[in-house]
Amino acid sequence: IYPEEIVEAVCKLLNIRFDFPYKTVFIGANFQNLSIECVPNQVVRIDNLPSGHLILRMDYHFHEPNLVEQLKLNKCTIITDRPINKDILRAFKTQIVEVIYIIGDNHVPDFPEQIRRAGVPFRLVSYFNEEKLNPIKLHYFDAGLILPIINRVPDELKDLDSFYYKSCKFTLSEQKAFNSRYALKNGFAAKSLGDNWQTFNKNNPHAADFWYEIDNFQVLVDK
C-alpha cells in the first residue's frame, strides 16, 4: 500500500477532502535508507551522517588532495575507478570504511592487493556485462568476486515515457545537492533534501544512468 492511499483512507474516515493529483507506481527497496555521497570537487563538513560515514565518489572526480582533506573530517566509503595512492590508504586506514573499486577499461589488477596491504576492506564491482567481464576475472582471481552493477528497469515503469521521482540518496557537488546521478549529469539540483522531486524523461541523453539507482526512488505519475 502506497503513502497517498493511507492518507486518503484517513481523510475519508475524518470526512476531509483529499485532493492529490498523483499516484505512486513504484517504491525502491532502499527508499527508506537515507545516504549522502560527495564528489571530491569540494570538501564538506557533515556531522551526524545517517550511515555514520560519507560516500566519496572518486569515480566522478578523481582528486587525491581533497580526498585527504575529507578523510580528516569524516569516515568515508571510497568509490573509485582508479588506483589511490597507497600512502593515503595506509595513513587513513582507520577513516576508510571500505574501498569499492570499479573495474573498467583502464583497470589495474594490482590495486586490490595494495588496498589489502594497507589493511583496508574492499569490494570489486563493474558496469561491464558478463561477456566483457569474463576475460578480466582471471586477473582478480585472488582478490575476490567482481559484483555486477545492474541497470534494471522495473516492469511498472517500462511503458512510461516520463514521471516524477523522489530519492533517499543525495550527491553533493560544487555546493549543490543532486538526488541521482541522472540529476547530477543534467545539472538538476534539488531544492532541499526534503523537497527533492524531479522529472525523469526516457529520451534524456543520460536516461540510462537513472536505472542504476532505481532502488533509491519513489516514482509518481499523474492520475
Each language-model region and where it sits:
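Detector for Asparagine
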Residues: 15, 30-33, 41, 48, ...
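Non-catalytic interaction/regulatory modules that flank or connect domains
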Residues: 16-117
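Acidic/Gly/His-enriched mid-domain segments of enzyme catalytic cores or analogous surface patches
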Residues: 104, 116, 122-152
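Long, low-complexity regulatory tails in eukaryotic proteins
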Residues: 165-223
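Leloir-type glycosyltransferase catalytic cores
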Residues: 1-38, 143-189
